[in-house]
From Swiss-Prot:
Function: One of the primary rRNA binding proteins, it binds directly to 16S rRNA where it nucleates assembly of the body of the 30S subunit. With S5 and S12 plays an important role in translational accuracy.
GO CC, one annotated term: chloroplast
GO molecular function: rRNA binding; structural constituent of ribosome
Name the record gives this protein: Small ribosomal subunit protein uS4c
Transmembrane segments: none
Family classification: Belongs to the universal ribosomal protein uS4 family.
PANTHER family named among the record's database cross-references: 30S 40S RIBOSOMAL PROTEIN (PTHR11831), SMALL RIBOSOMAL SUBUNIT PROTEIN US4M (PTHR11831:SF4)
Length: 201
């Protein structure tokens, strides 16, 4: 299954607030479609599937990509669910978004793909790059790149920058000081249900 490129608000209405996907307010609380207002108790599978979909759409991943992250998280020591969230949060595209350099993760992905973002002074155009503590993130020293990010910084997608990151607006740079804590993950979900979903496949 490829990455979703359809209407973002439609997905938010179905799954709830997805800060990484869209900054548009959800006008209707019920799901889209002809039967959106009908209520019924979802099955356990449906609940696990919904939590998985929240993760996939918020971070803009294909099914194959998310499954690879789940497998990687299982190989590391600690809570698999929390490690999964850390792996996703420490992606370069998400880190650019959390610094406020882009209003959404898709916008951050474009910045990275088009070579506007540097790690320790070197252009990195790989969205899945895992940011590490001690690394600096900056905007390419070109007028077009700087103007783009300056405009984004004026209207960030989220109000607060996580405690593991710091931003220097004057020189359009940020620094990774650690790994994100669970409390700073902006997405509302139960990550254990995501792990259960893949364990039962």
């Amino acid at each position: 299954m490829s990455r979703y490129r359809g209407p973002r608000v439609r997905i938010s209405r179905r799954l709830g607030d997805l800060p990484g996907l869209s900054r548009k307010a959800i006008k209707r609380s019920y799901p889209p479609g002809e039967h959106g207002q009908k209520s019924r108790k979802p099955s356990e599978y449906a609940v696990r599937l919904e939590e998985k979909q929240k993760l996939r759409f918020n971070y803009g991943l294909s099914e194959k990509q998310l499954f690879k992250y789940v497998k990687a998280a299982k190989k590391l020591q600690g809570s698999t669910g929390q490690i999964l969230l850390q792996l996703l949060e420490m992606r370069l595209d998400n880190t650019v978004f959390r610094l406020g350099m882009a209003p959404t993760i898709p916008a951050a992905r474009q910045l990275v793909n088009h070579g506007h973002i540097c790690i320790n002074g070197q252009v990195v155009s790989i969205c899945s790059y895992q940011c590490k503590p001690g690394e600096s993130i900056s905007v390419k020293n070109q007028e077009a790149s700087r103007k783009l990010v300056e405009n984004y910084l004026a209207f960030p997608g989220l109000a607060n920058i996580p405690s593991h990151l710091e931003l220097n607006k004057s020189n359009l740079s940020g620094k990774v000081n650690g790994v994100i804590d669970r409390e700073w993950v902006a997405l509302q979900l139960n990550e254990l249900l995501v792990i259960e979903y893949y364990s039962r496949k």
